[in-house]
Amino acid sequence: MEVLHSNTARTPVRAVLFDFDGTVSTLRCGWEAVMKPLMLEMISGGKGWDAALENEVEEYIGESTGIQTIHQMKWLAARVHEGGSNPEAPTDPWWYKGEYNRRLMEQVSKRVESLTAGQVPNTAYLIAGSEDFLQTLCGRGVKLYVASGTDHPDVCHEAAALGVDKYFTLIAGAPVGEENCSKEKVMAQLLEAEGLHGDEVAVIGDGKGEICLGCEAGARTIGLATNEREGGVDAVKRERLIKAGADVIAGDFSEKEALLAFLGL
């Protein structure tokens, strides 16, 4: 665990807001490798692309990690027609969202099926130490929430397949067919409806969006720079999360006691 902003003693957190994909679950590991070729194909019209376009797409995907998928597809739809190489391409961002989801779910569905059939343990698709960490937080009376840019039914289904849905007071994914961000709504609920102060809330995620949101609310922030394939800290994610203002960087939840101490627990 890397502490970036050392703080004086704080009160124990009462609620933790988690991102899901890449923070708790690895069921969607490799989503970038699905989104990138889709974007390149659509922007170029299948005519090939240069290194500059590839770098642009990679940079956008990295910077947009954690936001609602439809907003990524709105960027794609605009970029397709801005480039002019694919004038016959659809203009509707929801078309791109549907095509991306179709491609992605080809691999995600197989992983979920292997879980539900008992062919692999849930640890095969959980970030290291995540379930133990969730259990410990619940055992200490902390309320846990999920807010994800992935479609709400899919987040709920995948959390259940992993057996971690029972730890969360609320799981909020993106409303199907709507452009509403669940992360801002859940944070507002914690601060307003639950009557919590920012320092009583922590935000844990691998995207800059949720870390920025946590910083704005005065919450404690743990940037999870997960290397989903190999374990440890992903250097690119680390830099992005540092720029977003994360208080702490970790590669997973294996340093449980240090993370709990940071949360005042």
Regions found by a protein language model. Name each.
Residues 181-214:
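Conserved Lys-Pro-Asp/Glu-containing loop-to-beta segment of HAD-superfamily phosphomonoesterases
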Residues 203-248:
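Acidic, Mg2+-coordinating phosphoryl-transfer loop and its flanking beta/alpha structural elements
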Residues 2, 78-132:
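Metal-dependent phosphoesterase signature
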